[in-house]
Amino acid sequence: MLAKGARVSNSSGSFLGSRATLRPAHAVAALLQLSDDRYVMQLRDSNPTIFYPDHWGCFGGAVEAGEPPALALVRELEEELAVTLSPAEVARFTEFSFDFGFAGDGIRLRTYYAVRLPRADVDGLVLGEGAGLAAFEPERLLAMPRVVPYDAFALWMHHARGRIASASRGARDPA
């Protein structure tokens, strides 16, 4: 569902022409699943000062100075969805590093947490930030053209985690 008055840009690359300054930061993101295994995603605002505006992405955000990442995610989910969780209810899944040395900056981490919401339905979630929210089956979500690419990769890893775990233990692919 989209927030009241929200609209998605039809131009498939308009954000690429923006001259707005982007400010990389350490960040956290939720691989947020409902009991039916759909992933809950945020339609990002059209603000040109954020990475991938007008794209579907994971809920989450910047880690504040001195803040543990798990607590940052708990805070962000409260702000963005009015969901109250404890750090014990979020499980670290993976972490990506981004090297912004080309811009005179350093490494920035994006830490992904698996979060199950068995007691929630997407209709019961309250959007506090972003242009919209929706729940998607993994196959549909990963086939969509306007998904934040690094979030899409983390979602694919989460969805395929059983296959990846088997391969890392040395199992051979029968194909």
What are the residue ranges of the model-derived segments?
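Conserved Nudix-box catalytic region and its N-terminal flanking loop in Nudix hydrolases
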Residues: R38-E79
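Short secondary-structure boundary/capping segments
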Residues: L22, L31, N47-P48, A103-D105, ...
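Conserved hydrophobic "DFG−1" position in protein kinase catalytic cores
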Residues: L32-Q33, M41, A135
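Short connector loops at helix/strand junctions that flank enzyme active sites
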Residues: A25, P53, C58, G106-R110
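Unchanged
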Residues: A62-P87, T94-Y150
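Short, glycine/serine-rich, charged loops/turns that create anion-binding
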Residues: L32-D37, S46, S97
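Nudix hydrolase/Nudix homology domain
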Residues: P48-T49, P53, V122-A175
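Acidic, metal-coordinating catalytic segment for phosphate/diphosphate chemistry
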Residues: L2-L31, S35
